[in-house]
Amino acid sequence: MKQTYIVDGVRTPIGKFKGMLAAVRTDDLAAMTIAKLLEKNPELDPAAIDDVILGCANQAGEDNRNVARMAALLAGLPWSVPGETVNRLCASGMSAAIHAHRAIMVGDGDLFIAGGVENMSRGPYVISKSESAFDTGSKMYDTSFGWRFVNPKMKELYGTHAMGETAENLVEQFGISREDQDAFALWSQQKAARAQERGRFRLEKFAVEILQRKKDPIIFVEDEFMKPNTTLEALGGLRAAFKKDGSVTAGNSSGLNDGAVALLMASGEAVERHGLKPLARVVSSAVAGVEPRIMGIGPVEASKKALAKVDLTLDDMDIIELNEAFAAQVLACTRELGLVDNDERINPNGGAIALGHPLGVTGGRILHSAALELQETGKKYALVSMCIGVGQGYATILERA
């Protein structure tokens, strides 16, 4: 089997809900990110790309009908380069990268663009069609986030808990206090603020030009969801968002966000042929299913599977990127894995509580961030994992190249 390498990557700044990126079409957002990745690698012939694979969780609006293919064409790739869109909800970006990894492993290609896009601000309203003449039972849903068109049998079997409710279920099951959740959220904000101050995120992102009618374009540079000046007191004053007398709040949760990411992934042969300098090698990956009502525990089982495949343990991991859907969810996972809450390996540059969580993007973002961190620190292994709505977890192990 061939080896797979993450060679390069780039992302947009992450936009807040109805923020700076709300004016940008989802397919354009993906296209400009792909174009920037190619611009960063001028030695590559775009026609040599074997496939473009993007994750996207919504796909109800401008991201419909295979946004990866649309974005590839809009980015200027020749029509001979194909494209595929994958959907594993919160882990869509990671799934896209592992799709590329598997294709490289079995010899189906040597050069791939993988990543994801999500513009939750632009998720459309959708309405069901009438089932019969004069039927007044049509329903309308906001597709930005959450369940829609639920199968009654699904609700009967597993319930349709909102994501925040699944976090509250973990709070109850693992006895996680509000104070611990807020402390973790503050830690995420502080780490992200330090990373921003030292220019760490400049290694990941590019400035987005947002066109204005009859005005000069706006240049969007900095992640806008971050709250670097928050305090424990401010976090402690927020009301529970999902359950009366609950402890999961807007402050200790990730947000609804917009963005795009693109990774250049290559086989060892392609690295040599094109003179590329890889960041990290994909060592192992695994996906696992868990009970939907506690979907946030998914990274535990996925991580165990990914580690076992290659006879590694958590002690071998130098960096642990665990997506912060909710502070409660991260703490449930770390405690179940036997880690202390403030293990210095966890999300060294902050996570989604600070930066935001554009669903189709985050998996690709944290893979790239972990690969860069391995290079910057000279460390060997990173474990990158995330929970997934409806009860799954995904994990990938990287080794510094």
Regions found by a protein language model. Give the residues of each.
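Condensing-enzyme catalytic core mediating Claisen C-C bond formation in acyl metabolism
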Residues: M1-T26, F145, V150, T231-I297, ...
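Active-site nucleophile and cofactor-binding loops and adjacent substrate-binding regions
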Residues: N64, G83-S92, N252-L256, V282, ...
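Active-site-proximal alpha-helical scaffold in enzymes
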Residues: V86-E118, V171-R200, A262-E269, R335, ...
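N-terminal extracellular/periplasmic Venus flytrap/periplasmic-binding protein-like
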Residues: R11-T12, A23-M32, E43, D180-R273, ...
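Short, well-ordered amphipathic alpha-helical segments that serve as non-catalytic structural scaffolds
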Residues: D27-N41, V67-A71, A96-H99, M163-L170, ...
